[in-house]
Swiss-Prot record:
The keyword Amino-acid biosynthesis applies. Pyridoxal 5'-phosphate binds at residues 100-101, 127, 211-214, 269. Keywords: Amino-acid biosynthesis, Aminotransferase, Arginine biosynthesis, Cytoplasm, Lysine biosynthesis, Pyridoxal phosphate, Transferase. The lineage of its organism: Archaea, Thermoproteota, Thermoprotei, Desulfurococcales, Desulfurococcaceae. Binds 1 pyridoxal phosphate per subunit. GO terms for cellular component: cytoplasm. Its EC number is 2.6.1.118, 2.6.1.124. It catalyses: [amino-group carrier protein]-C-terminal-gamma-(L-lysyl)-L-glutamate + 2-oxoglutarate = [amino-group carrier protein]-C-terminal-N-(1-carboxy-5-oxopentan-1-yl)-L-glutamine + L-glutamate; [amino-group carrier protein]-C-terminal-gamma-(L-ornithyl)-L-glutamate + 2-oxoglutarate = [amino-group carrier protein]-C-terminal-gamma-(L-glutamyl-5-semialdehyde)-L-glutamate + L-glutamate. This is Putative [LysW]-aminoadipate semialdehyde/glutamate semialdehyde transaminase. Its main location: cytoplasm. One of its GO terms (biological process) is arginine biosynthetic process via ornithine. It comes from Aeropyrum pernix (strain ATCC 700893 / DSM 11879 / JCM 9820 / NBRC 100138 / K1). Substrate binds at residues 130, 268. Involved in both the arginine and lysine biosynthetic pathways. Its cofactor is pyridoxal 5'-phosphate.
Amino acid sequence: MNVVLKFVRFYGYRGLRIVKGSMQYVWDDSGRKYLDCHAGHGAAFLGHSNPAIVEAVVRQARELVAASSSFSTPSLEEALTEFSRIAPPWAEEIVFLNTGTEAVEAALKAAWLATGKRGIVALKNSFHGRTLASLSVTWNPRYRRGVPVLDTRFLSPSTDPGEVEKLVPEDTAAIIVEPIQGEGGLTKIYAELAKALREAADRVGALLIFDEIQTGFGRTGRVWAHESLGVEPDIMTAGKSIAGGLPASAVLSREGVLATLASGRHGSTHAANPLSMAAVAAASRFLREEGVPDKARAAGALLEGLLRDRIEGLRLVRGVRGEGLMLGVELRLDPGPVLRCLQESERVLALRSGATVVRLLPPYSISREDAEMVVYGLERCICGGSGC
């Protein structure tokens, strides 16, 4: 007798079967419509089934799906051209991969090879992935438990910039930082700390890595969130939305850094595959031609303003955090019941960040009506019958 294998879920099941999506909305198998502020952990920032991405992927699927990066393909060439138009000006080299954690692994490996050192510095409350090296620079002890992770020195995001120099050892190969901590309660790194980390990296000959997997590609209202810090890294990771929701990631570096991974020092079967590259090219073009970062900044300002007006003063709310369309509401209680209420009663999908923050990662296309739906739904779900 054939038995369907049991699917092991990495994340807690939300009790919802999603069958269709269109831009900022998804539908379940009963036809109910939801505003999606979860967006596949932020991957659907350009919208579910964005026609520009769908058209490019369907066209490519009819021509060529699989090819090793030992060969050149038109879709890879197009992806390089389009992504280069939105890349930060300091970047000179790029590799395409499949997932965010893969990008972090490659970034750290390149740093080790380029510097000849082994030490790593990261920030407390960071999240960079769940494979071995990326897990080693992820703070959450629950994720790390039982796994022989690499030694990492963790600094507080509130570290005094004047203290950074003596906290970064001489044997450091890489300092890795998220401009805004996706799982760390949406804590923003401040410019003074970023500058101190840049100076410390230069002093010891380490490479500074900015992890822009969640913050990048327009979500914060800039193409890359680190643009607001006045600091340039040596390496940057990108992922989630760079292929319009399909699996793709990238690592960018200064000249000579990623080159250490060439000629068999690194590899990935599906890296730079034609289908994903067609999606990266289409997504990059759409981001630029449609002015997506500017639209995200405007939509984020609207949503943040409504949250501050209606939500921030509630008795059970500590504050509103984030930037652009990467926003969070810090609560004085477990966000789990609030997330369930949003889904079941308000038809808004969201997720948590850290222990007490409701995280909102909607597509760039949300409207004022959508923003009001989120805010009034949050107000009802936070207050319940308490009259707060």
